[in-house]
Amino acid sequence: MSEIIRQVMISGRVQGVGYRAWLAHTAEAMGLHGWVRNRRDGSVEAVLAGSEPIVSEMIARCQRGPSAARVEAVVAEIAQPDVLNLRQPGERFSILSTL
């Protein structure tokens, strides 16, 4: 099965509620790799890579998020493999610094 890569932007009340940690833990548990970070505009950005059904399921879960989050929108776009280079060396899924 071929791998797909999606760049996902999540907006709403998604900072200060454990969203990045939840996303990283959930994605890793599902066998995905990539990264997640806060953005200064209050949104969360993630890159998810893996098989199409698993990436699609994770994007659907992003619409709910952790219990304290209030997600308003999730936008996913096709991403190029080079975006995965932002991960920390040796990690399957990284939590990056705010951009």
Curated annotation (Swiss-Prot):
Residues of the active site? R20, N38
Q: Of which family is this protein a member?
A: Belongs to the acylphosphatase family.
Per its UniProt record, what PANTHER family does this chain match?
ACYLPHOSPHATASE
Asked if Translocase is a keyword of the record, the answer is no
PROSITE patterns in alphabetical order? ACYLPHOSPHATASE_2, ACYLPHOSPHATASE_3
Q: Which UniProt keywords apply?
A: Hydrolase
State any single GO MF term. acylphosphatase activity
Q: Which gene encodes it?
A: acyP
Q: Which InterPro entries match?
A: Acylphosphatase (IPR020456), Acylphosphatase-like_dom (IPR001792), Acylphosphatase-like_dom_sf (IPR036046), Acylphosphatase_CS (IPR017968)
The UniProt record lists the Acylphosphatase-like domain at 5-97
Protein name listed in UniProt: Acylphosphatase
Provide the catalytic activity annotation: an acyl phosphate + H2O = a carboxylate + phosphate + H(+)
Q: Look up the EC number in the record and give it.
A: 3.6.1.7
